[in-house]
Design a protein with these regions (language model features):
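N- or domain-start disorder-to-order transition segments that initiate the globular core
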Residues: 1-28, 426-460
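Acidic/histidine-enriched segments that form metal/cofactor-coordinating
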Residues: 36, 63, 67-184, 292-296, ...
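A structural supersecondary motif
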Residues: 248-252, 274-314, 486-499, 625, ...
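An aromatic/glycine/proline-enriched structural segment found at the starts
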Residues: 2, 160, 190-191, 195-250, ...
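C-terminal regions of mature proteins
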Residues: 345-456, 560-590, 717, 722-793
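Active/ligand-binding-proximal structured segments within catalytic/core domains
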Residues: 16, 23-74, 133, 251, ...
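Non-catalytic accessory/assembly modules
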Residues: 121, 125, 174, 198, ...
Length: 793
């Protein structure tokens, strides 16, 4: 655990704005969240989707910042993160940037919420984007499930309503609609109806200064009087069924009249419901043949009400009756255990998870906790509060059949099942990865390659390990061979990622540095058996969004186009980054794999040609990933391409999403894929064909010369040089770049790249643009459309 929890402070500004501040010196980025106490349920019934539509419009210009100088272009230009989310009763806006840019981002965020332009032409363009999202939403299996479960709620309750917007529910030319839109913004986007959360490495005094200066922008005035929602009564167990694929089961409990402290208690409930250990609910459901995987969600939470949903990937014997019988048997056993026993280990797990959250997830989680429990503590404590202890039995008392609604789809009409196997209830065992590692002397030799380029810190170290074959590569085993270790690693603040089926054999550990060596040691033990006896590849669960499906398989498709020749293997390569000395000493005590250590791969073969890979999908929409490899791996080339990609982000997004409304999922980034680095562009569209999407992308690239060269290079150069320095805010990206270069050349020196970045000029940038847009420039397309003429497959 950290020697001291982060410093935090809460205050109220004169205009009524609630503020929460959190300072952690090891946070590489600073982040901000503004939560508004209004969402889709507060929108006028005559205009479903108005709240979500307004969320989109905020990004299209404000009183002091035109759209071209708003929050989104700033974040894109500075390599940060940004998003917004309209929920049932809240709307969130959040971003992360380097600490020195937090003030600039916060000024733009609060200005756009307080004084949006809401220009008519921008409204028309953005409504089409919203309509595209609506089409995708209306066709999804998740929507069918949500609408079916809503039928079990009281008709007068807003959670039972239809709140998605489209071009027909948003009549832009109607004066009444425009009046409602402006009134919604004025009525709800007030300081007293908002929460501002800031987190970063800056001193609390600096965070408070920013909050007071920029928070004063929001208008004062009383918060809108919240209308109490109708009760969520116990109406008896009921099920909706559908024959449509995919196979799914969902259970939803309607919780009502919950006391203060319930949401803190719910954190413990979530951990117990999802605990992947013998005797836990997921293990019990699998043993009974009822569920392969379990996911928990809160579709609705407000004050003393909530909808708790368990989403289930059905097991081989799954039925509604079998699932509910196994669930309620497990819950009955849970109720018999004293709360003090259930709490054991929970605080340690929760505190470790919070201690390793990046800045952006941290402000989001803190904002959620403080919004639901206004009087609660900001940081997890060693035990539940008195209010949470009192709320615990009342929370469990509502997890009963009388409050359950279920949805079943894609299951056989008749299924013969054996009696469910009783699984004894069990509590989570102690997690060995949460234990304080023993002190070790500094080793005389270090068998693992360690880079000192990234500044060491406890909060985030990284370790990469890869096995490689010079000839055909056997399929990587499914992550299931690792047993409980991915879950235990997550509890200890370590994100464990293993190769997806069909991809190269690579292990990545990222997170709490003192726990990395022990996690590596236990994972290696599990993987060694798979190396000795490779297994048939498993089928990965599908991603819910088409573009994410393509991104998931991209890492295995690109290397297949340029395989390295030879035979032999496996051999291993590894690299640790950002570890303090104590973690380095612990790492030295971990025995490396018994296989030989691999030599550097050398420079990759030159990539050429236009390659199209068809990824079959049942989705009616079309999605395209376009990868444009840079011509070589020289530092000067890489530096120019990285700057070029950064300059292209804003014009690509503006042209494809805003002006042409080509799709609602549009992104571009510099990516390292296999042996190649370059520009990756992704678009998903509900109406355009893959070839039309590609043509629009190429046209935008061809027209981008002026936009690429429009800005002075000074700020961009400095930002990129900082990104590849020891104190970078992009720790994972720098570590990945070190790992990429180390595999190729064995070198751990980024000085040549930093020097090339510092020396960039317009001539180098123009040369990179010419390489990208040349008629014979190599291309790789991954799409759910057939290979067109003229492309290699």
């Amino acid at each position: 655990m950290p020697a001291h929890p982060p410093h935090h402070r809460r205050l109220h500004l004169a205009n009524g704005l609630a503020v929460a501040l959190l300072q952690d010196p090891e946070l590489p980025q600073a982040a901000a969240l503004v939560r508004i106490g209004a969402g889709s349920h507060q929108a006028p019934r005559a205009y479903p989707g108005l709240a979500h539509f307004l969320e989109h419009l905020f990004f299209l210009g404000s009183r002091h910042y035109p759209a071209a100088d708003g929050l989104m272009p700033l974040v894109q230009r500075l390599g940060g993160e940004l998003n917004a989310s309209t929920r049932e009763t809240t709307t969130d806006f959040f971003f992360a940037l380097a600490p020195e840019h937090l003030g600039a981002g916060l000024a733009r965020l609060l200005d756009m919420l307080a004084a949006p332009l809401l220009a008519p032409d921008a409204q028309h363009r953005e409504r089409e984007v919203l309509h595209a999202e609506f089409i995708a939403w209306s066709r999804s299996a998740d929507t069918r499930r949500d609408l079916a479960l809503a039928t079990g709620l009281p008709a007068t309750h807003p959670a039972a309503g239809f709140h998605a917007g489209n071009r027909y529910s948003l009549p832009l030319n109607a004066p009444a609609f425009q009046a409602a839109l402006h009134d919604f913004q004025r009525h709800h986007y007030r300081a007293a109806n908002a929460l501002l959360v800031l987190a970063g490495p800056q001193p609390l005094a600096e965070l408070e200064r920013l909050a007071r200066e920029q928070g004063a922008i929001l208008p004062a005035g009383p918060a809108p009087r919240a209308k109490a929602p109708p009760p969520l009564p116990a109406t008896g167990e009921g099920w909706q069924t559908s024959s449509a694929a995919p196979a799914t089961l969902a259970l939803q409990f309607a919780l009502d009249d919950l006391p203060s402290g319930s949401w803190e208690a719910a954190e413990l409930l979530e951990a117990l419901l999802l605990g992947e250990h013998p005797g836990g609910l997921p293990a019990s459901l699998r043993q009974a043949g009822q569920a392969e995987r379990l996911h928990l969600a809160w579709p609705y939470r407000q004050a003393g009400q909530g909808l708790l949903r368990l989403e289930v990937v059905p097991g081989p014997q799954a039925t509604p009756a079998g699932l509910t019988a196994a669930l309620f048997t497990w819950l009955t056993a849970l109720r018999q255990i004293p709360l003090a026993t259930l709490e054991q280990g929970h605080a340690a797990r929760l505190q470790r998870q919070w201690a390793t959250l990046p800045a952006l997830p941290l402000v989001r989680r803190l904002g959620e906790r403080l919004w639901l429990d206004r009087d609660g503590l900001a940081w997890p404590q060693p035990k539940l509060s008195v209010a949470a202890q009192a709320a615990w039995p009342q929370l469990l008392a509502q997890l009963v059949p009388e409050r359950l609604r279920g949805f079943a789809a894609g299951l056989p009409a008749e299924r013969v099942t054996d009696a469910a196997v009783a699984s004894p209830f069990g509590l989570p065992p102690a997690n060995p990865l949460l234990a304080q590692p023993p002190d070790r002397p500094v080793p005389g030799t270090q068998p693992w390659p360690v880079s000192l380029v990234l500044a060491p810190q406890q909060r985030e170290g990284l370790l990469f390990l890869r096995w490689q074959w010079l000839g055909p590569v056997p399929a990587a085993p499914d992550i299931a061979v690792l047993g409980a270790w991915p879950r235990l690693a997550a509890e200890a603040g370590v994100n464990l990622r293993w190769s997806p089926p069909g991809a190269p054999w690579e292990l990545r550990l990222q997170g709490w540095a003192p726990a990395l060596p022990a996690t590596l040691e236990r994972t290696l033990h599990q993987l060694q058996g798979a190396l000795d006896a490779p297994q048939a590849p498993a089928t990965a669960p599908p991603e819910p969004m088409l573009i994410r499906q393509l991104l998931k398989v991209l890492p295995e498709r690109l290397p297949a186009l340029m395989p390295r020749t030879g035979s032999g293997g496996p051999q291993w390569q590894a690299l640790a980054c950002g570890l303090p000395q104590a973690a380095q000493a612990a790492l030295a005590a971990v025995a490396p794999p018994p296989q030989p250590r691999a030599a550097p791969l050398g420079e990759p073969p030159r990539f050429s040609g236009r390659h199209w890979h068809h990824e079959p999908s049942a989705d009616a929409q079309q999605a395209v990933l376009l990868f444009c490899p840079q011509p070589d791996t020289q530092p000067t080339t890489e530096a120019a391409w990285r700057l070029l990609v950064a300059r292209l982000q804003a014009p690509l997004f503006r042209r494809l999403r805003t002006e042409q409304q080509l799709g609602y999922a549009v992104f571009s980034a510099y990516r390292q894929l296999g042996d190649q680095g370059g520009l990756l562009i992704g678009v998903q569209s509900p109406h355009a064909r893959a070839l039309d999407i590609l043509a629009a992308i190429e046209a935008c690239l061809g027209d981008s010369r002026a936009a690429v060269l429009a800005e002075a290079l000074g700020e961009s150069r400095q930002q990129l040089v900082r990104d590849f320095g020891p104190t970078t805010t992009q720790r994972a990206a720098l570590a990945e770049r070190l790992w990429w270069g180390f595999q190729r050349s064995g070198a751990l020196d980024l000085a040549p790249l930093r020097e090339a970045l510092a020396a960039l000029d317009d001539e180098a940038l123009l040369q990179a643009w010419t390489q990208l847009t040349a008629a014979n420039a190599p291309r790789v397309v991954l799409a759910n459309a057939a290979v067109p003429p003229g492309w290699l497959s």
